[in-house]
A protein has these predicted regions:
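Cys/His-rich short segments
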Residues: 1-3
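Active-site-proximal loop/helix segment associated with metal-binding centers of metalloenzymes
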Residues: 27-36, 97-111, 155-162, 217
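Short, surface-exposed connector motifs at secondary-structure boundaries
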Residues: 43-46, 62-69
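Metallo-beta-lactamase
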Residues: 5-20, 46-48, 54-56, 60-63, 68-78, 80-132, 141-142, ...
Length: 225
């Protein structure tokens, strides 16, 4: 038996979920500042959340897993090599209208603040702030998985969810409003584009976001928790 080469390691399984197993793609791109991308397998086809660097070995592995039917680009910073992936798998791309100039070839646009059901168990939620067209993707109705782009991530040293003013490129006030939009979710996994992922126990998600919002209310000039 030969050891698996590093090129064949990715995608790596993160978690199994009734709405679709989730994989980390690796192969981060300098063009997206090393952002993470994720692959969701599903009965209605596979979805790539944000774009990794183009990689023939990664594409080969993804093809074995059923290919890619749709690409979701959460915001303008993390589009990376989306054109290569779309061409290789002949799949449609989704981006918010307000960030669409970063991927003008994208076939589909999310408009305004309305939640869009991309498929039965996958929703796109506009969360303007980090960029005007930022959005997150939510998988499942229970034990939800949130693909948060650059909107939120986890700080393991302080055990808090972070929304960062230092890395807000559009409107910080609107970003905090977008954090509030997510309070009623039941997130089990937070999978960001940058920063740490985190697994929440029941009830912890709401507590974490409330803590973030309380901190910012007391320290409006603070850049980051």
């Amino acid at each position: 038996m030969t050891a698996k080469s590093s090129a064949d390691v990715f995608p790596i399984l993160v978690t199994k979920h009734p709405a679709g197993d989730v994989y980390y793609c690796g192969w981060s791109s300098k063009r997206s500042f090393g952002a993470s991308s994720w692959l969701v397998l599903g009965a209605e086809g596979n979805v790539l959340i944000d774009s990794p660097r183009w990689s023939a070995p990664l594409a080969k592995q993804i093809k074995k897993m059923g290919g890619i039917n749709q690409i979701v680009l959460t915001h303008r910073d993390d589009v990376a090599d989306h054109a290569n992936w779309a061409k290789a798998f002949n799949c449609e791309r989704w981006i918010h209208q307000d960030d669409a100039d970063a991927a003008p070839e994208a076939e589909k646009q999310v408009i305004g603040l309305d939640v869009l059901s991309l498929r039965k168990n996958l929703k796109l939620i506009p969360t303007p702030g980090h960029t005007k067209g930022s959005m997150v993707a939510l998988l499942g109705d229970q034990q939800q998985i949130l693909f948060s782009g650059d909107h939120l991530w986890w700080n393991p040293k302080k055990s808090v969810t972070v929304a960062s003013k230092d890395y807000c490129w559009w409107n910080w006030t609107e970003q905090l409003k977008s954090v509030e939009r997510l309070l009623d979710l039941e997130v089990h996994w937070l999978l960001p584009g940058h920063g740490y992922a985190h697994q929440f126990k029941p009830g912890q998600w709401n507590e974490a976001l409330e803590q973030t919002l309380r901190h910012e209310a007391k320290s409006p000039s603070s850049g980051q928790i």
